[in-house]
Amino acid sequence: HGYSRLALIPAFDDRAGLASPILPNSVHGAIGAIIRERQESERLAARGISPTRSAILVGPPGVGKTLSARWIASSLGKPLWVLDLTAVMSSLLGKTGNNLRAALDHAKKHAAVLLLDEIDAIAKRRSDESDIGELKRLVTVMLQEVDQWPDSGLLLAATNHPELVDPALWRR
């Protein structure tokens, strides 16, 4: 399995429950809205509306991005799978696109909540002159995957450096 080399694992299984993290009201409200949409996905689908399928969590280290992702997954009764993209980049350059796609396909099949940690490691602005061609191709892979993410799953990304993330990813 290609995804096994990417350390895609059910990193946190808080389905028994996890207390709501202490967050600013605006952040708590935005995350709560995503949870409510996901919980009401059948009612939304009956009206031809798709729930939120992806979100980017932003902030400096230690602010609670991973804890927030855990809370979202727990509230939805699903485990949180974490894919550390920094590790992916350091170990698999040359095969990263295929392996990333395999990991994402695996997560789709299991309707998991998937957190792409350190999204800025691969989803850099395509205008970055210092970037190598493979990284630019990875941005394209990520954009295609986000566009095709099923309503049954939730794709989260986390970054400490929002200014490095390709603007096209923000629009999704």
What spans do the regions from the language model cover?
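Walker A/P-loop NTP-binding motif of AAA+ ATPase domains
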Residues: S26-G32, R36-R172
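Interdomain "pre-motor" coupling segment immediately N-terminal to P-loop NTPase/helicase cores
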Residues: H1-G17
